Amino acid sequence: MHNNLVNIYKDYIAIIGAGISGLTLGIVLKKQNIPCIIFEKFPSISEYGAGISISRNGQKVLKEIEILDKLKLISGNPKNAYFISNNKEITSFAIDHVTTSRKVLHSILLEKYLELNGEIKFDYQLINIDNQKKLLSFSNSKNLYVDHIAACDGIKSICRNLLSKDKLDPVYSGYSVWRSIINEKQNDVRFYLGPNFHVVTYPVDDNKTSFVGAFKRLKSTEESWRTLGNYNELRSDIPGYILDKYPSIKHNKEIFKWGVYTRTDMGNMYMDNITFLGDAAHPIVPFMGQGGCLAIEDSYIFGKLLIKYRNDIKKTQSIYHDIRYSRVKKIRDDSLNQATFNHLKNPLLIYIRNLLMKYTNIIHILTKKVWDYDPKKEIANINNQ
């Protein structure tokens, strides 16, 4: 081992994974000149064709890292959301989401990180971590000491598998999701609720729409992470009267079916010299549209804490856990409950749900605390203590 090569990043925060959480963390750190480097296992970055919705809480971070305006210009900016049950509109309300594709968000984050002279290493597949020595070993035979490890490597986190004693492997949630980006123009968000399924559609730009169809299926053995499907399979899970509203989906060659996976428990958000962010820390079912926003929040808050307590990683981790754990757990639990709420089968319960949605502010109550959350204020509160 050449010592100079092994030690080249010993003062750096090592970010494992160049996804949304990894790039966001990299930007937050680079803006304050904190040495960091991203290690990505793939030879290049390729985000899949799926939509992502960013509510106010996530937008506050994107504004702070100076990419929100650019994202808005090339994304959807729906102002209203409509809820439909049994092909009839129940209610609608005003929203201020940015709806886009993961690919677009990812490319803007990457561009910003590189603009800040951020360093990223491709083809660096992690195979071992010595958490006491903070030594990373990769499949390309490189071994590198680092200052701290930020695990941003998703639900199938190699970092967690290598280190965590809780061994919480991802488990099938009982839900699967059809996803596609289709050639349809739409200006609003539409939720179609039905027995054992729901569909969400929203614009990702001026000409394309994200289609997400979630359904309940208890056969976990056949549910892979992601498979290429076709229109006939989609039609067996999602009613034709909804699909007929989006005729271009019939000819779409990229219709993917995802098994929705989670963990039975959240597990640790940090251990020794490693901290978990995003899906590596807390995968959630996507039924409140908060997976991406929570990852963005994690990265902003952990990054700001690293900057504030640069020489006290234990304090950084402890405060990160205290700030994040209860919020994430609440949204995680509420997301599962939302699936049940969306997929009611009993006609009486459906009738009651629809009345509640139409004549009360239940949606506002369920979403206000989630969307109004301000990561900047969270950090400011610490500064004022």
Regions from the PLM with identified roles:
Residues 180, 189-221, 238:
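Active-site substrate-recognition segment that forms the wall
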Residues 21, 44, 156:
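Conserved Rossmann-like nucleotide-cofactor binding loop
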Residues 333, 337-372:
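Alpha-helical membrane-targeting segments
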Residues 12, 35, 208:
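Residues at the starts of beta-strands that form the adenosine-phosphate
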Residues 170-175, 187-188, 224, 231-232, ...:
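A short coil-to-beta-strand element that immediately follows conserved catalytic motifs
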Residues 14, 18-31, 39, 150-151, ...:
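Conserved mid-domain beta->alpha element of the FAD-binding
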Residues 2-13, 55-164, 168-181, 218-237, ...:
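Conserved N-terminal helical subregion
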Residues 30-50:
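Glycine-rich FAD pyrophosphate-binding loop
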